[in-house]
Amino acid sequence: MKKQDISVKTVVAIGIGAAVFVILGRFVVIPTGFPNTNIETSYAFLALISAIFGPFAGLMTGLVGHAIKDFTTYGSAWWSWVICSGIIGCLYGWIGLKLNLSSGRFSRKSMVYFNIGQIIANIICWALIAPTLDILIYNEPANKVYTQGVISAVLNIISVGIIGTILLKAYASSQIKKGSLRKE
């Protein structure tokens, strides 16, 4: 089996993606009134980076970005949610493999596929995995963390569904469509 190297382009994407994730996570959030639960724009951006550069870039961007955001905001990381940011980035990247955004096409069928995938991924990560890890790692009360998880899942579904879809459409539209250039 041939060893696959990580390209410089992917490493740069992870670094820039993590930095933008931190900025969005710190400064472009809308509070919900429920403790530690916000409408996050950073996950829509994570969906874009993941769809363009793949599951590994999504995983690393989510992990590094969320960890730095937590350290700079709270002084320490809430590892159960950091892990889930990595998982969701990987899942967005996996969904993005089928989208083929570089072809310049992001059809309604692709939008539906992306949104069904992100809905399932957000429910798995935020409503199931994150609260379960909170209980196992931090001994948090189940009713509190599952409520936070469900609220976060719904808010991320909405944020990624609207902002993420717009970002993916804008990116695909900026690409040259295959066969659109003709030799004269």
UniProtKB/Swiss-Prot annotation:
Keyword set, alphabetical order: Cell membrane, Membrane, Transmembrane, Transmembrane helix
Highest taxon of source: Bacteria
UniProt name for this protein: UPF0397 protein SAOUHSC_03020
Family the UniProt entry places it in: Belongs to the UPF0397 family.
Lineage summary: Bacteria, Bacillati, Bacillota, Bacilli, Bacillales
Protein localization: Cell membrane
Segments traversing the membrane: 11-31, 44-64, 77-97, 116-136, 148-168
Membrane-related topology note: Multi-pass membrane protein
GO annotations of cellular component type: plasma membrane
InterPro entries attached to this UniProt entry: ECF_substrate-spec-like, UPF0397
A Pfam entry, by short name: ECF-ribofla_trS
